[in-house]
C-alpha cells in the first residue's frame, strides 16, 4: 500500500499545480485491501476548477499527468466538481457503492 500512497501523493501534487483539489477519495481494490499486482488505483478527484470544463478535457488533464509522471501502479481517476459528485452519489451505482467504503485522501498532506 505504501507504493500506492506514494503514487497518489505524486499524482495529487502534480494535479494541484493545475487545479485546486478540494477532496480525493480512494476506492476500488486498494480501498478494500484486495488489490493484486496488476491492480490500478481508483480515485475520485473533486475540484471546483472542473466547473465548465468539458469532461473529455478533464480526462485529458488526468491522463497527461499520469503519463508525464509514469506513475505505477496506474491511477484511474474520475474528475468531478462538488456538484457533480452530489449528483453521482444519487444517480451512479458505481459512485454510490464506492461511497460505502472509500477512503478520503488527506490532501494536501499536513506539514511535518
What name fits each language-model region?
Residues 42-46:
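Short beta-strand->loop micro-motif that forms the acidic, two-metal-ion catalytic signature
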Amino acid at each position: 500500500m505504501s507504493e500506492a500512497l506514494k503514487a497518489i501523493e505524486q499524482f495529487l501534487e502534480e494535479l494541484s499545480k493545475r487545479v485546486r483539489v478540494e477532496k480525493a477519495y480512494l476506492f476500488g481494490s486498494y480501498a478494500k485491501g484486495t488489490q493484486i499486482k496488476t491492480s490500478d488505483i481508483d480515485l475520485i478527484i473533486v475540484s471546483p476548477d472542473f466547473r465548465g470544463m468539458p469532461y473529455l478535457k478533464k480526462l485529458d488533464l488526468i491522463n497527461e499527468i499520469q503519463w508525464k509522471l509514469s506513475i505505477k501502479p496506474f491511477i484511474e481517476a474520475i474528475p468531478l466538481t462538488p456538484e457533480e459528485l452530489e449528483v453521482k452519489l444519487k444517480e451512479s451505482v458505481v459512485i454510490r457503492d464506492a461511497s460505502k467504503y472509500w477512503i478520503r485522501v488527506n490532501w494536501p498532506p499536513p506539514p511535518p
